[in-house]
């Protein structure tokens, strides 16, 4: 009987090289994107995030549930989604890892846009889905950096990057502000609204990504069909 009003999805890693998960997938792919796809599917299909679209337990106007994805403006200009290699594990090093971080932020934002589309009908928002970039944050995301760089990066982070408390303020706004009631598919760079990379908004990309994501997880989890939402 548990219901959530808000889901803030923030998990992310920045490993210095490719690392396989126990499912045989790339860690940055599984943590930074696929886990968020699976979690949203499960919470929506089971009505834990109340919605009329998939679970038939939608909230009345003025009480719209909210999903907020923490992303990065580094997605701007990232490579288009490669569906031939989507979900395929292969080895790479530090330089490619930086590109992969930005790439999977583009993937995440494309998914968020498609999810927002599916959760509204004829101008009525069933569940709002918004994305934000907190800017540079003094966090431990570089904890796996090579030892020779870790101390230097820690110094740079502490001097020039925002504290987690300041970085969380736009998240609190998206979570609780009455100004955001019923608004969906917005992107905030800190507190500033802006456009995401234009590739994110292509409807055919969103549909292809949804189908590809579901296919990857069905190969891993034989129970996936019980909670993954329709590919349509």
Regions found by a protein language model. Name each.
Residues 112, 116, 172, 210, ...:
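Non-transmembrane alpha-helical segments in soluble domains
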Residues 107, 166, 208:
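Charged catalytic carboxylate motif
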Residues 202-232:
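Intracellular terminal tails of multi-pass secondary transporters
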Residues 155-195, 201-205:
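C-terminal helical subdomain
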């Amino acid at each position: 009987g548990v219901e959530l009003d808000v889901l803030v999805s923030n998990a992310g890693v920045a490993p210095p090289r490719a690392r396989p998960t126990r499912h045989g997938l790339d860690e940055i792919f599984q943590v930074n994107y696929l886990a968020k796809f699976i979690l949203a599917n499960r919470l929506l299909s089971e009505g834990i995030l109340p919605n009329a679209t998939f679970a038939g337990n939608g909230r009345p106007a003025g009480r719209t549930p909210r999903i907020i994805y923490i992303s990065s403006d580094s997605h701007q200009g990232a490579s288009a989604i490669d569906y031939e290699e989507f979900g395929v594990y292969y080895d790479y090093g530090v330089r490619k890892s930086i590109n992969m971080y930005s790439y999977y932020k583009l993937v995440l934002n494309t998914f968020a846009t498609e999810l927002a589309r599916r959760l509204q009908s004829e101008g009525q928002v069933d569940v709002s889905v918004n994305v934000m970039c907190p800017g540079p944050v003094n966090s431990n995301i570089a904890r796996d950096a090579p030892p020779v760089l870790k101390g230097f990066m820690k110094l740079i982070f502490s001097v020039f990057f925002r504290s987690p408390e300041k970085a969380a303020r736009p998240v609190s706004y998206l979570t609780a502000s009455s100004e955001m009631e019923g608004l969906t598919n917005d992107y905030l760079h800190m507190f500033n609204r802006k456009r995401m990379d234009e590739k994110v908004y292509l409807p055919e990309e969103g549909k292809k990504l949804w189908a590809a994501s579901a296919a990857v997880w069905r190969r891993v989890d034989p129970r996936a069909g019980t909670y993954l939402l329709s590919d349509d």
